[in-house]
Amino acid sequence: MSLEVILQLGSILLVVAAGPLVIVLLSVNEGNL
């Protein structure tokens, strides 16, 4: 495992995890307002 591969996998995981989190946060904020 090279450092570049680890960085690429990490960035992909961050994007995949950030997608649903952003949607949930937006829905929660709209619900509270």
Swiss-Prot record:
The UniProt record lists the keyword Methyltransferase: no
Protein task: A core subunit of photosystem II (PSII), probably helps stabilize the reaction center.
Topological relation to the membrane, as annotated: Single-pass membrane protein
Localization in the cell: Plastid, Chloroplast thylakoid membrane
Coiled-coil region list: none
Main location, first listed in the record: plastid
Pfam families named among the record's database cross-references: PSII_Ycf12
Subunit structure: PSII is composed of 1 copy each of membrane proteins PsbA, PsbB, PsbC, PsbD, PsbE, PsbF, PsbH, PsbI, PsbJ, PsbK, PsbL, PsbM, PsbT, PsbX, PsbY, PsbZ, Psb30/Ycf12, peripheral proteins of the oxygen-evolving complex and a large number of cofactors. It forms dimeric complexes.
Gene name, Swiss-Prot/TrEMBL: psb30
Transmembrane feature ranges: 5-25
Annotated family: Belongs to the Psb30/Ycf12 family.
Name by which UniProt lists this protein: Photosystem II reaction center protein Psb30
Any GO CC annotation of this UniProt entry: chloroplast thylakoid membrane
Biological process according to GO: photosynthesis
Key words of the record: Chloroplast, Membrane, Photosynthesis, Photosystem II, Plastid, Thylakoid, Transmembrane, Transmembrane helix
